[in-house]
């Protein structure tokens, strides 16, 4: 008991103070001026809005999605908004070779990379699971595995720039919901994998931040169509959501929560988990590992 009072409680107090107050660093749009940013899934919805915000802030932007025609319009508008440069590379994230080559091409177009924003998903609809293994496999490959491939391809450039990785995920990656089992599984995988390698980067002194964005229902056309007649709740605005994601990435926050309900943030931002992670991390030794 005496040890807890004299050692453990002060440490936990300092940890909690850091956890809650470090997020209040001021964001300034000029932080993005001249930065080199990739945005995937950028032909519509949150991805497109992020590209537009980045353009207004004077960033270099490379966007990707499947639709060449739509991406051309996005790039044209980015240039009108003031992007330092804007390019598109069309392709599907079902193709891991494309995913890897896309990052290399984007890096050449911009002359490097400061921020990798991963936002794409495969098409999904709300329904009960009916033994569709193909859909589960496709969801895991596009929504999860391609994120890993893109990250691996981008890491050499991000290490040079001390850059940032931003993962756009979902409340469905932290709380189980019916009728989206494959989608939810892929989002749980994202949260587990990128939370884990964030710890590894810290332990190995890799100065690349990872921001996991946990989103509720957002008013994108895709989401509204999927939940129509099934889920009755108000959606948050995609324009504001996109800006909060960018802010979180620039400020190198570990997690961003965005939902119309304050309860979502309060209940999911779990300080006890952070304390447990901190305590567990003290028991690791990397002396015997071969890099």
Swiss-Prot record:
- UniProt pathway annotation: Steroid metabolism
Q: Which reaction does it catalyse?
A: an 11beta-hydroxysteroid + NADP(+) = an 11-oxosteroid + NADPH + H(+); cortisone + NADPH + H(+) = cortisol + NADP(+); corticosterone + NADP(+) = 11-dehydrocorticosterone + NADPH + H(+); a 7beta-hydroxysteroid + NADP(+) = a 7-oxosteroid + NADPH + H(+)
Q: List all annotated glycosylation positions.
A: 123, 162, 207
Membrane topology category: Single-pass type II membrane protein
Top-rank lineage group of the source organism: Eukaryota
Provide the primary localization: endoplasmic reticulum
Q: Where does substrate bind?
A: 170
* Keyword tags: Endoplasmic reticulum, Glycoprotein, Lipid metabolism, Membrane, NADP, Oxidoreductase, Signal-anchor, Steroid metabolism, Transmembrane, Transmembrane helix
Query: A single GO BP annotation from the record?
Result: steroid catabolic process
Question: Which residues does NADP(+) bind?
Answer: 41-67, 92-93, 119-121, 183-187, 218-222
Question: Which GO MF terms are attached to this record?
Answer: 7-beta-hydroxysteroid dehydrogenase (NADP+) activity; cortisol dehydrogenase (NAD+) activity; steroid binding
Q: Which SUPFAM superfamilies match?
A: NAD(P)-binding Rossmann-fold domains (SSF51735)
Q: Which CDD domains match?
A: 11beta-HSD1_like_SDR_c
Task: List the Cytoplasmic topological domains.
Answer: 1-7
Disulphide-bridged cysteine pairs: none
- Location relative to the cell: Endoplasmic reticulum membrane
Q: Return the Pfam families for the record.
A: adh_short
| Segments crossing the lipid bilayer | 8-24
Its EC number is 1.1.1.146, 1.1.1.201
Tell me the enzyme class: oxidoreductase
Q: Does the keyword RNA-binding apply?
A: no
In terms of Gene3D superfamilies, this protein maps to: NAD(P)-binding Rossmann-like Domain
The catalytic site is made up of 183
Q: What does this protein do?
A: Controls the reversible conversion of biologically active glucocorticoids such as cortisone to cortisol, and 11-dehydrocorticosterone to corticosterone in the presence of NADP(H). Participates in the corticosteroid receptor-mediated anti-inflammatory response, as well as metabolic and homeostatic processes. Bidirectional in vitro, predominantly functions as a reductase in vivo, thereby increasing the concentration of active glucocorticoids. It has broad substrate specificity, besides glucocorticoids, it accepts other steroid and sterol substrates.
What's this protein's family per the entry?
Belongs to the short-chain dehydrogenases/reductases (SDR) family.
Q: What is this protein called?
A: 11-beta-hydroxysteroid dehydrogenase 1
* Natural source organism: Saimiri sciureus
The top of its lineage is: Eukaryota, Metazoa, Chordata, Craniata, Vertebrata
Which gene is annotated as encoding this protein in its UniProt record?
HSD11B1
